Design a protein with these regions (language model features):
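Conserved N-terminal alpha-helix of the aminotransferase class I/II PLP-enzyme fold
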Residues: 1-30, 182-209
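Alpha-helix N-cap/helix-start capping motif
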Residues: 6, 29-32, 51, 127
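Phosphate-binding glycine-rich loop
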Residues: 9-47, 57-64
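Short, acidic/glycine-rich phosphate-metal binding loop used to engage nucleotide
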Residues: 22, 31, 74-75, 110
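Short, well-ordered alpha-helix to beta-strand connector turns
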Residues: 22-23, 82, 100-102
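PLP-dependent aminotransferase-like
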Residues: 39-98
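Active-site region of PLP-dependent enzymes
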Residues: 93, 103-210
Length: 210
């Protein structure tokens, strides 16, 4: 085959890295898997996150082998998965947003700022993470047929499809230089967008810290 369709994914990754200000960008199928892959790479242990965030964030930490702790505080746009240099950036997408030496995870859900429909992205300056994430997102291989590569690491089915990447490239063509964060208020009911996750049985044993 003359052209690998996953070249479109690479083009989208390059576009997002240039826009956000990171050296590298690794596309995934959603922000949750981006967080899980990054957490796996960091070998997280105890991770502190806000008590009000999206349900899958603490689950991604647990799947990566970490323990979740909650803290009561308000956040806007992004927050850190403390004490690691890992940021949930699902509600922010603006030029130059990348924090040097960090790992920032984006969302392209239909309700997010770049509404591809589904998709996520890891922003990083760490070349070793690029190798790990690009292989692990695609079942341990590069974007080739399985008989054309050696599978040396454990991976997941967490890659972005060329179709999603093509839509992302199209939307970025007219995306503004600066965009405001998505607010954490439910516009329909004028109440907090996220419930307190400590009320769910899954997280009832998670410690709350100050």
């Amino acid at each position: 085959m003359r052209h690998n369709p996953f070249r479109v994914v690479e083009m989208f990754e390059e576009t997002m890295a240039d826009y956000c200000g990171s050296k590298f960008a690794i596309a995934t199928d959603n922000c949750t898997d981006a967080l899980m892959i990054a957490a796996k790479y960091l070998k997280v242990e105890e991770v502190t996150i806000p008590a009000r965030t999206y349900l899958s964030v603490p689950q991604s930490i647990m799947h990566a082998g970490g323990t979740v702790k909650f803290r009561d505080y308000e956040w806007e746009g992004i927050y850190q998965l403390e004490p690691y240099p890992l940021w949930d950036s699902a509600k922010r997408l603006t030029s130059g947003m990348y924090i040097p030496d960090s790992i920032m995870c984006l969302s392209f859900h239909i309700k997010k700022l770049l509404p591809i429909g589904k998709g996520g992205m890891i922003l990083t300056d760490d070349e070793e993470l690029v190798y790990f994430a690009k292989r692990s997102r695609y079942e341990g291989r590069h974007e080739v047929r399985m008989d054309k590569d050696n599978i040396a690491i454990l991976g997941w089915n967490a890659y972005m499809t060329p179709e999603q990447a093509a839509r992302g490239l199209t939307l970025m063509h007219n995306y503004p230089t600066h965009a405001k964060d998505i607010p954490n208020i439910n516009s329909y009911e004028n109440e907090p967008y996220y419930p307190d996750l400590r009320n769910f049985d899954l997280f009832k044993d998670c410690e709350t810290v100050k």
